């Protein structure tokens, strides 16, 4: 799932301007990294990496990275995201939880939310697993949740794009139906892009029929963090 993105020469030049500052905090926790990068560097590097990963690599990961604020506000946001990530991991151990920048990259694979072949409807097990996440999402209401749907490689490109959009939408509508605010959500479908397993076995194809989340601070959380809250 991890990929190396080749940045443009301009992006590399800008990124190198902040290499020393970033290197000094590379071993820090995510809260410390939010402060150590700094406001300007956080916004610039977050924008560059988020934009490039979103176009040429994992979209959810790029969205989570691209939301960087940096500075003291970034540290406060990072602390809240650290706590939320731990609670998600405890609530649903079958999910893959990754803290990136000032956001959370969450993969709900076949162990958490499974989709049958050519289906976008949620299975009873998928609903039960989503139910485990709802209390955490409600506790951290000042976050935006972007949902990305995916398919395996079977079928035509346009069909898979539509199917992946429907999968993301199914998850969104289920969560809204459980009381989460619709304004927090955005959905996208990426079809066969960003596979996390080979598509040459039934097991691998099942893993690729998934949804991923990018959980980031909303405007209120950002403003609260800037106010030191």
PLM region spans:
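Solvent-exposed, polar/charged alpha-helical surfaces in well-ordered, non-transmembrane soluble domains
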Residues: 86, 90, 124, 128-135, ...
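Amphipathic, membrane-active segments
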Residues: 81-112
């Amino acid at each position: 799932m991890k990929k190396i993105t080749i940045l443009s020469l301009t992006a590399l030049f800008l990124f190198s301007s902040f290499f020393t500052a970033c290197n000094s905090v590379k071993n820090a926790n995510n809260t410390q990294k939010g402060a150590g990068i700094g406001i300007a560097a956080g916004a610039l590097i977050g924008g560059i990496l988020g934009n490039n990963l979103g176009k040429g690599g994992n979209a959810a990961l790029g969205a989570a990275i691209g939301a960087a604020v940096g500075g003291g506000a970034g540290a406060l946001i990072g602390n809240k995201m650290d706590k939320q990530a731990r609670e998600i991991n405890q609530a649903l151990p079958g999910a893959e939880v990754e803290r990136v920048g000032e956001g959370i990259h969450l993969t709900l694979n076949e162990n958490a939310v499974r989709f049958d072949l050519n289906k976008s409807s949620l299975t009873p097990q998928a609903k039960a697993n989503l139910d485990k996440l709802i209390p955490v999402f409600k506790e951290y209401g000042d976050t935006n949740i972007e949902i990305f749907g995916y398919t395996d490689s079977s079928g035509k490109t346009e069909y898979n794009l539509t199917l992946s959009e429907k999968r993301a939408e199914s998850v969104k509508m289920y969560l809204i139906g459980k009381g989460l605010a619709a304004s927090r959500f955005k959905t996208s479908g990426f079809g066969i892009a960003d596979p996390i397993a080979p598509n040459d076995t039934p097991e691998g194809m099942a893993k690729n029929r998934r949804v991923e989340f990018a959980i980031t601070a909303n405007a209120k959380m950002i403003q609260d963090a800037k106010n030191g809250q």
